[in-house]
């Protein structure tokens, strides 16, 4: 356990293992603890970095702070603090905005990008229209509650569902970002067409937040991007089927060598 005084905050992070770095960026339903099924697997060959985004876990967001609009610069500052020049990025949901935004601004620092259950920070007309159509069909306000994982998890593994909810409950109340997203951290249509960073999208076939057809479409916007769909999983493949998730990510990273 360690702390980094960076970017106006005191960021909590952990580092496990040695070798090439993999940074894991959690989603809105988690924090650094979310990756408990990934770190023991990947630390045998890689240096695994987990952290709490500002406003999550043990990283406090200053009053009136920029919130999510600072996530990508926070990541850059953390890497600088750790002396990591290039890294693999594994992003879950909200963490996709962090990592896609970081890659859009500093592609030379990314060995490979995994976008799990997310397409955040990507801006393209077809993607936007698909997401709008999805939200227009929803009859209730959009929330993470009850949608973070597939109902089948609570039926078959109530212990795992309870653990997920308990990890999420450790986070303080969320704050809304202030200001506008820096355009440097937006993967525009033009940037996506020229994308050179190896990229993998992973989707749960039961995800109702970012359904697999939308993520598969997102993968077509990046030259050479890969797409994997995992059965019987909702919005948290890394948690619901860690064995499949770890295997898919491990094969992708090995292929980037």
Residue spans of the language-model regions?
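Conserved HGGG/HGGXW glycine-rich cap/lid loop of the alpha/beta-hydrolase fold
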Residues: 9-61
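Flexible "cap/lid" loop of the alpha/beta hydrolase fold
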Residues: 100-105, 110-140
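Conserved alpha/beta-hydrolase catalytic His-Asp/Glu region
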Residues: 124-125, 140-194
